[in-house]
Structures are given as structure tokens and as C-alpha cells.
Amino acid sequence: MAPSADPGMVRMALLLLPPLWLLPLTGGSQRAEPMFTAVTNSVLPPDYDSNPTQLNYGVAVTDVDHDGDFEIVVAGYTGPNLVLKYNRAQNRLVNIAVDERSSPYYALRDRQGNAIGVTACDIDGDGREEIYFLNTNNAFSGVATYTDKLFKFRNNRWEDILSDDVNVARGVASLFAGRSVACVDRTGSGRYSIYIANYAYGDVGPDALIEMDPEASDLSRGILALRDVAAEAGVSKYTAGRGVSVGPILSSSASDIFCDNENGPNFLFHNQGNGTFVDTAASAGVDDPHQHGRGVALADFNRDGKVDIVYGNWNGPHRLYLQMSAHGKVRFRDIASPKFSTPSPVRTVIAADFDNDQELEVFFNNIAYRSSSANRLFRVIRREHGDPLIEELNPGDALEPEGRGTGGVVTDFDGDGMLDLILSHGESMAQPLSVFRGNQGFSNNWLRVVPRTRFGAFARGAKVVLYTKKSGAHLRIIDGGSGYLCEMEPVAHFGLGRDEASSVEVTWPDGKMVSRSVASEEMNSVLEILYPQDEDKLQNTAPLECGQGFSQQDNGHCMDTNECIQFPFVCPRDKPVCVNTYGSYRCRTNKRCNRGYEPNEDGTACVAQVAFLGGYSSAAFRLSEPLSQASYLSLGLGLCLQLYAL
């Protein structure tokens, strides 16, 4: 006969268990409706010219032929690089970088290079994006046997400027093995630098930051001199670099840089406003030193106006870090659900609204490493005054359990307002590219915003906020590099469901801002926003509809309304404490808590302050890291006392 349990111990255990309604919702079972349908056979059928079966890696989206439409640039590892253009007459993607020396795109093929990372941006201010390929010939780390390529459209064709005499003499062409590359306008000039995440071997191969040297360049004569400014910018570090993403993460407008690394801590380079950076990853709680990062993306998942970070760890727990503020300092908190964080051999991570329902999805592109490993898809659903609900979705045809996923991008290449998904494969098996279209949300509203730099190029790193009539403010960053080895389209894509946009605001890396109304007839279209000229300041006082929770300020821009200072007072007597939030407010009771505890979001209970858990800072407490027995004991005892007090 089994011994009976002690009733007192059972009651104690029940007290220590949180109520079921306080447990985070994780979505339960996977949603049955498939999100994606494969259209590869009709849009990009495998063939020798446009979709060869080869090892491919990074993918980027830019306007290669300068005709106003996007092309998809693919980094070929065992074959040529590809430039895929959508042919509307044929309803197909066609490679325009053909194997003909007379073609202006011939050099982009670079058949000799083992390309892995790719990015595009305007480095010289001519209004046209250059294209950078990171090659890793014959090297996993340290020194490679073939240089990277930086292509510029010059003399009516694409040419590698790293091989120009001036740059050969300067020794700026990287011979180091690396992974991701990304574009950053570090000073707000409209001219971009290229951040190179090298894979160091000991003290060989630090990260690099390549940009134009204006004093040594003569653009009228076609001379574009380059320099590596990583050391002076404060980003020259030795690490096993993996993923890179760029945007105003900590800054209000200036571009910061997040790098998730392997065999070492991540970097969060905070732009100091003068083009130099300070690594704040540890203090912000995103250093994750014991994991091995891969794909990364930036987004505002809970629509609080702050930039959050999502990334995958190689066969480790994936992270979804919400940006918080504690005592005036930035902290990130991992809210990944158990299913979301489940380890996998992840490569690319993409955050986008694939069904235009207002909520962002996160796509994990895995590689079939040693065994099958299907791709995964999650919806991150905003909840008022609470952490987002994370719901697992059915990727449909994009499941690809045997896919050797290495890269991927989103773009709307056919102009229907729905994001298309392009995945690359390789490394352990040659596979063609895959193309997918969404199955859901065809009747939902959408808006696509394309900001331009002062020179007319895509304003990568710019922040776009769309104010709506019913659902508050939505934030996007114009991508300068993300995913893993990749760069998404330079568009702020907003899915709006049944809602409509009221106004849009663009903030450039130099702090310049433009706000304008969005008319009803402009819904379901593409808006281009030009860089503001000095005379545009006179137009900023035009009336704007900012939507619920926001109001137009004297400077002409929409800002959060502080309802807590309004008269009459907005909170009832039983919840007299008003807390202003982004686009809203909440009311809670005036609850007092013992030392080491603080009121929860609605003030109904006291919860332990993270700073008191075993000496861990409140930056980012992780249950995956061991606590001492004394810490667990003090935490459990404290919870008992607080529950008893209630």
C-alpha cells in the first residue's frame, strides 16, 4: 500500500502553484489551416538558368536594374549568384544575371566565389544601392582564399570596387571567413557602412565596418575609396559572428546593431549619436553567453513603441525578448513560450505579417541536420496590458521537413499586397530555391511604406510608425540586414485586418521626421516617403488624425496621450493608481508589497522582483540558468508569505 500524502504538505504545494488563469497562454495545439502554398513549380521551376540545384545561402531584396521593382539576390555557394526578377507577362521569376559577358549583370554571378552573406545599400550617396557578397572560400573560420565582393553599377555595368587599385592598395577587401553582413547609416548621413560579422579564429578575423572614405574618393571620376572604421567605431571584436540586425533598438532614431554570436556573448552596439558604439548586451540582458545564435529579426511585438528582438539559437532555446524599462534603464525580458523556445537546428528567422491581420508571425527556417527538421511558424498576438499570446501555426507547404534551409526573405514581388516567402537551401545537400504564397487574409487591408534617403535610395534603418483608427500604433524598421545571412525588402509592410490607417510617421537615422495623413483611398497601396527638405518644416503643422490614445503635438507629430493627467480622472475609486501606457492606460489598486516584491500589472498581487532572485540582475533572469538552493528556498518562502498575506 502506498503511503498517504501529508495533507499539510499538499496544501502548501497547492499554495505554491500559481492559479491556472495566471499561467501564460501558449496557444495549445497547432492551428490546422495552412499558412503557405508552394508555387515554386509555376513561379520559379527548378532549371539550370534561374533556379539551379546548388548550395545557396543568403538572400537579399533590392532594385538591381533601377526600374522601381524589386529583385531577389541569392548568394550562390557552389554555383553562380542569382538575380531574380518577376516577369509579369510570364508570371515567373527569371534570373537576369545570365551567363553572358555582355550582360550588365554578368559580374554579379561571381562564379568563383563561395558566397554566403549578402546585403545591399547606398554607400556613396548616388541614390542607387551597392551589393555586398561575403565569400568564405575554403575556410570555416579565420583566413579564406578569396575576397569578398562589393559591386557598384558603374560604366553601365556592375563592377567590383573592392578590386579597384585604390582599394587593393588600402587592403580593405576582406580575406576572412564570415557569415552575415548588414548595412548601417552610423552617422545619419544617408551613406551606409557595411558591417561584416566575421568568424574569427583566435585573434584572426575581427568584425569589420567598411564605408566610403570621402576625402580619398572622387566620384566624378569613378574613384570610390573604402576604409575599415570598425576600430574607431568601437565594433572591432573577435568572435564567432553569426546573425546581424540593424535599427533604432535603444536609440530613438540612430541605428544600433545587434549581433547574435557563437561560442560567446551577443553584442548590442548602442549608437552614441556620433557614429561610435558601446556594447550594452550584458547590461540589457541579451548577451546569452552560453548559446549559439543564428537568425535574428527586429519588431515591436506588443505595440508599445519599443523595438523587440527575436532570434534563434542553434539547437538551443530560441528567444523572444521584449524591451522593458526598469528604473530608467533598458532591460529585455524573454517571453518565449515552451513551444516557441524549443531547440532546433535553426538558420533564418523572419518576423512579418503574412496574412495582414495586424499580428506578426515569426518563421523559423530550419536545416535538416542529421535528421528531419521541419520549419515552424508562430503568431505573436498582442494583448492589452499583458504579454503577447504566442500561438503555433501550420506552415503548410513551407514545413519542408527535409529542407536544408540556409536563408530566406519576404517581399511582395507580384504586387498583390501579400508577402511572399522565398527560402534557400544548401550546406549539406544541393537543393533549389522554394517560393511560397500565403493562403489567408486576402480580404484584409494593408499598406506598404517605402522611405527614401536624402539621395533617393532606400532608407534602411529608418523607423516607420503607422497610426490607425482602431488598433493604435504599429512600428516597423526598414531592414538593413536580418534573418541570417539575409536582408529583407526595404519596405514597412503593415497588415491592418479590418482597420484603416490614419497617418504615418517616418524617422530617419539622423533624427529627421515626416508625418502625413493617409487618405482612405490610399489604403491597399504603396506609399513612398521622401526625405524632408528644410522647406518641409512649414508643412508639419497640417492636422493629423492620430487615432485612439494618441494626439498631435505642437511639432506636428503624433505622440502618446497621457490619460492619467486628464480631468476628470479616468480611474475608478477602487483602482486609484493610473499608469500611462503607450496608446492607452491602466488602473490598479494601491497595493503595498514587502521588500523584494512589487505589484503585478493590475495591482492584485505581489510578485518577486527579479533583482532579488539569487543575486541575478533584473536585466534578464533565465530559469534555464541554475539558482542556488538558498535562492529557491527564499523565493518559495517569500511566495508563501505573500500568498498568506493575501
Swiss-Prot record:
In which broad location class does this protein mainly occur, judging by the first location in its UniProt entry? secreted
Instruction: Please name the InterPro entries in this protein's record.
Output: Crtac1, EGF-like_Ca-bd_dom, EGF_Ca-bd_CS, FG-GAP, Integrin_alpha_N, NOTCH1_EGF-like, UnbV_ASPIC
Query: Where does the record place its FG-GAP repeats?
Result: 47-89, 106-148, 284-334, 396-438
Provide this UniProt record's keywords sorted from A to Z. Answer: Disulfide bond, EGF-like domain, Extracellular matrix, Repeat, Secreted, Signal
**What GO cellular component entries does it have?**
extracellular region; glutamatergic synapse; growth cone; postsynaptic density
Where is this gene product found? Secreted, Extracellular space, Extracellular matrix
Is this entry keyworded Kinase? Answer: no
Q: Which SMART domains match?
A: EGF_CA
Domain (EGF-like): give its ranges: 560-606
Task: From the UniProt annotation, give the residues forming the signal peptide.
Answer: 1-28
Q: Which GO terms describe its molecular function?
A: calcium ion binding
Instruction: Name the species this protein comes from.
Output: Mus musculus (Mouse)
Disulfide feature: 564-578, 571-587, 593-606
The alphabetized list of GO BP terms reads: axonal fasciculation; olfactory bulb development; regulation of synapse assembly
UniProt-recorded name of the protein:
Cartilage acidic protein 1
